[in-house]
Amino acid sequence: MSQLLAAGGRRLSGEVTIQGAKNSVLPILAATLLTADTVVLRRCPRLKDVEASIRILEALGCTARWQDDALVVDTAGMNGCAIPDALMREMRSSVIFLGAILARCGQAALSSPGGCELGP
């Protein structure tokens, strides 16, 4: 078994740049529905699932725009509680919007999620 030994007693300092990750940003995009304020997500990756999430937000009446490497989401205009079937089928993780829509609207309507088929 290999080991990593760290000798203590020395102060750590410096900077680490954290890059955006799809598995982090998708739940955060859904969580933007929990506020009626503008949310700015810096170093947001421009991926197909992120774009699909943006289309879901827009279908609910929200706005989203790219500003350099940041995604600016404004949910003040949210006026719906149903995600269209076509958007639900774009990605398997679209179901993550359910909790935030329920919290904000008190009800939600969505079909089965889509995305890549898993298994035989």
In which residue ranges do the predicted regions lie?
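Short, structured segments at the rim of ligand-binding sites
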Residues: 1-120
